[in-house]
Regions:
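N-terminal loops that bind phosphate or other acidic moieties
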Residues: 1-205
Length: 205
């Protein structure tokens, strides 16, 4: 992995998450307790600070790159979504390490690791597409990346997946307990925020 390209793409994704904070807050105020955007923004800003500290300037190993990001995510994001991100990223790093000797196209290596990470995350959460969670954006991204090797198509699939949660009744998460009809009006905040990250990421790849 080209460190400069990786940082540029990650920075773009993080900027997209931060820019989406008002919209995520609006959605979460309708169907949640309004703290989803706080966690996402806090995590994004913490990773930005790491990138700007130049500690990653000499990193040319993708798994090691992720390890440093994971450390920040684990300390800056709380709640269920923070735990899921940490679990997924740890599994993603492990998946990349298992393929370190392969000569496949870079996107295919990342896709295989991403798919493996999805399987690992499933051991810790019952969330699946259709449950109105961040998985509604993550799963189509991983599936499309696996099928096509195209990050832009994968990001579009994530965006479509997030938008599909509008009107979807929640099976998991706080929305289940809050109830009401707000879910008919807005997409899942976590899925929307993650889709924005993927869209920003793809713009630099």
């Amino acid at each position: 992995m080209d460190p400069a390209l990786a940082r540029s793409a990650l920075e773009s994704g993080l900027n997209a998450v931060i820019a989406a904070e008002p919209e995520v807050t609006r959605y979460d105020t309708v169907v949640g307790d309004g703290d989803c955007s706080i966690g996402l923004k806090r995590g994004a800003e913490a990773v930005q600070q790491l990138l700007q500290s130049s500690k990653l300037s000499s990193v040319d190993d993708a798994a090691l790159f992720l390890d440093q990001i994971i450390g920040v995510v684990e300390t800056s994001m709380d709640g269920t979504s923070g735990a899921l991100y940490a679990i997924y990223l740890n599994a993603l790093a492990s998946g990349l390490r298992s393929q370190s000797g392969q000569s496949e196209a870079r996107a295919k290596v990342w896709a295989a690791a991403a798919k493996s990470a999805m399987q690992s995350m499933a051991k810790y959460t019952p969330a699946k597409p259709g449950d109105r969670t961040l998985v509604d954006a993550l799963a189509p991204f991983v599936d499309t990346l696996t099928q096509t090797g195209d990050v832009h198509k994968a990001a579009k699939a994530a965006d479509d997946g997030a938008n599909s949660t509008k009107g979807m009744k929640a099976s998991l998460g706080r929305t289940v307990y809050i109830g009401g009809q707000g879910f008919q009006e807005v997409p899942d905040p976590g899925a929307y925020g993650l889709a924005q990250f993927f869209t920003g990421l793809a713009q630099k790849l």
